[in-house]
From Swiss-Prot:
Family: Belongs to the fatty acid desaturase type 1 family.
Recorded catalytic activity of this chain's protein: an N-acylsphing-4-enine + 2 Fe(II)-[cytochrome b5] + O2 + 2 H(+) = a (4E,8E)-4-sphinga-4,8-dienine ceramide + 2 Fe(III)-[cytochrome b5] + 2 H2O
Keywords, comma-separated and alphabetical: Electron transport, Heme, Iron, Lipid metabolism, Membrane, Metal-binding, Oxidoreductase, Sphingolipid metabolism, Transmembrane, Transmembrane helix, Transport
Membrane topology label: Multi-pass membrane protein
Protein name: Delta 8-(E)-sphingolipid desaturase
Domain notes: The histidine box domains may contain the active site and/or be involved in metal ion binding.
UniProt organism field: Lachancea kluyveri (strain ATCC 58438 / CBS 3082 / BCRC 21498 / NBRC 1685 / JCM 7257 / NCYC 543 / NRRL Y-12651)
GO biological process, one term: sphingolipid metabolic process
Length: 568
């Protein structure tokens, strides 16, 4: 019989540095497991103090789910109200500091924190699991359930500071979300969770987790033909441009299979899928699957949060939220993302620079991949501990066959080498468009810890409407809403799962966002333009206020000099 653990004791344990997560009413202490977690430490950090039942079931197979139970230290005997995790700025108290009148549970009242030390470095030593080095306050204060009745969550403020301009814009987006989404109270979110799990069970019973391996034979055949065509055009026809283009097309298609393998959605066997994915990503594509998984796992859990989701943290080049104007501290990268002089020049024009910037996206992935492997940012222990060395060998091999043998030895002139590299890499731009298309135009609001898993995924993700015969070109990224709800679902079954999601959305009253590829790109560009306009407005406001202050000082100095002359 499991011990009953009170809310106060759980708060105390988290304050003492334990990684406490709630799963199906069980209290799990993952403090010792976190260093072995194949999905990385950040994914667990964002679930501390929360009921992560839906997330844990969505991202893990049944065998792994059973392993969770070995880490239980007791259970709860009440409906759980989520704490704000330490990594997101949560405050936790020891037992002797707790009082009934100051419970950290969810409330319908606004609790305004003193944010004067926002993003300031914490002087005392860290003691909580995942606690960042700087002080972080969420947009919605700890323990608050935002609603339309709670005007503090979205009201516009009198502009006394340039930053208020951007803050008012973000508040308006929060208001729009509160108007269109179901209530955030615990009962409504619990109902959404139950309906989501009913849908999940229907998808399981329909056999949609069974992978059609013949479809992957077709995918690999197509990719193999593209590589063969690239080789033939270069070595037998001396068609450098079209050879590079074919190479880029093959890489673009490879990314989708690596994505599937990273989610363990092909064989559903952890080691097999990861080995397959690493061969494709590192050895053939020159990218780290481990980097992508660490990044992507956090993205799935805290989708479109400007402070925590690395997939929308692209300063100084892009900003998809005005909150990024604030010199925020990224809890993923563990550093400040400065809205510096360069960003102030680029972001106001980001809707025009969007496609040119994405054309060079693959070069940035090389940088991130090498940093991940060399710095050992992935798991160093457990069943994923050896991946780092396998990927390092893969990255070296890729640089040998592509940059040395093909570019360095086969191509004779500097211009030919430059052209081949640029054409092959710019061709992969399409996949970067497809990735950003799914989320850049969607909600970036912070709606507090009361928001459940299914609602967050639906409001932050977009699907792309395309004919079945074009599914190969999008590689499953056209079903990002479905994928975010069921990350382990085989890619070729996402279309079959789509009707279940549409029916679910109609039942619970959440918009299912889907656009054609052209229309979707237009929506993204419109969002980027809106943020660009806000950046221009804020910067113009700052400039005007500075001039006004300077003008007043000059007028005061002139008056003082005049009086001094008269007195003399």
């Amino acid at each position: 019989m499991d011990n009953i653990i009170s809310r106060g004791e759980i708060e105390d344990r988290i304050a003492r540095g334990q990684a406490i997560v709630i799963y199906e009413g069980l209290v799990l202490n993952l403090e010792k497991w976190i260093k072995f977690h194949p999905g990385g430490d950040k994914a667990i950090h964002h679930m501390i103090g929360r009921d992560a039942t839906d997330e844990m079931k969505a991202y893990h197979c049944d065998e792994t789910v059973e392993i969770f139970r070995k880490w239980r230290i007791g259970r709860i005997d009440q409906e759980w109200e989520n704490f704000l995790p330490p990594i997101q700025g949560g405050v936790f108290r020891f037992l002797n500091q707790q009082h009934d009148s100051t419970d950290l549970g969810l409330s319908n009242k606004w609790i305004a924190p003193n944010t004067s030390d926002q993003f300031k470095f914490i002087k005392n030593e860290k003691h909580m699991c995942g606690e960042p080095d700087v002080k972080i306050y969420p947009k919605i204060p700890q323990g608050v359930i935002p609603s339309l009745n709670l005007k503090e969550a979205y009201e516009k403020k009198v502009v006394t500071d340039p930053a208020t301009v951007a803050d008012n814009y973000d508040n308006e987006l929060v208001r729009q979300d509160l108007e269109t989404l179901p209530d955030l109270d615990p009962k409504t979110q619990e109902w959404l969770s139950k309906e989501y799990n009913k849908m999940h069970n229907e998808i399981i019973e329909a056999g949609l987790y069974q992978c059609n391996y013949f479809r992957y034979v077709k995918e690999l055949t197509r990719i193999g033909l593209l590589f063969a065509l690239s080789y033939y055009l270069l070595y037998h026809r001396d068609q450098k441009f079209w050879s590079a283009f074919s190479m880029g097309c093959a890489w673009q298609q490879l990314v989708f299979i690596a994505h599937d393998a990273g989610h363990i959605s092909i064989t559903h066997h952890y080691q097999l899928d990861n080995i397959f994915g690493m061969i494709i990503a590192s050895w053939v594509g020159g990218l780290s699957l481990g980097w992508w998984k660490r990044n992507h796992n956090v993205h799935h859990l805290i989708t479109n949060d400007p402070i925590h989701d690395p997939d929308i943290q692209h300063l100084p080049f892009f900003a998809v939220s005005t909150r990024l104007f604030d010199n925020i501290y990224s809890t993923y990268y563990e550093k400040f993302l400065w809205f510096d002089a360069f960003a102030k020049k680029v972001v106001p024009w980001q809707n025009y620079l969007y496609y040119p910037m994405l054309a060079f996206g693959r070069f940035n992935l090389y940088r991130l991949s090498w940093m991940h492997v060399l710095l050992g940012l992935g798991p160093r222990r457990g069943k994923a501990g050896w991946f780092r060395y396998f990927e390092l060998c893969g990255l070296i091999f890729f640089n040998y066959w592509f940059f040395y043998l093909l570019v360095g030895c086969k191509l004779q002139t500097g211009w030919d080498r430059f052209q081949y590299i640029m054409v092959s890499h710019i061709t992969t731009m399409l996949v970067h468009v497809q990735i950003t298309l799914s989320h850049f135009a969607m909600s970036t609001s912070d709606l507090g810890v009361g928001e459940g898993f299914p609602m967050r995924q639906l409001r932050t993700s977009m699907d792309v409407d395309c004919p079945r015969w074009l599914d190969f070109l999008h590689g499953g990224l056209q079903f990002q809403v479905v994928h975010h709800l069921f990350p382990r679902l085989p890619r070729h079954n996402l279309r079959a799962a789509q009707p279940y999601v549409i029916e679910f959305c109609e039942k619970v009253g959440i918009k299912y966002s889907i656009y054609g590829f052209s229309k979707g790109n237009g929506v993204v560009l419109t969002k980027l333009q809106e943020i660009a306009v806000q950046a221009k407005t804020m910067l113009e406001c700052a400039s005007a206020m500075k001039k006004e202050a300077t003008g007043e000082r000059e007028a005061d100095e002139k008056t003082y000099r005049t009086k001094s002359i008269k007195n003399a």
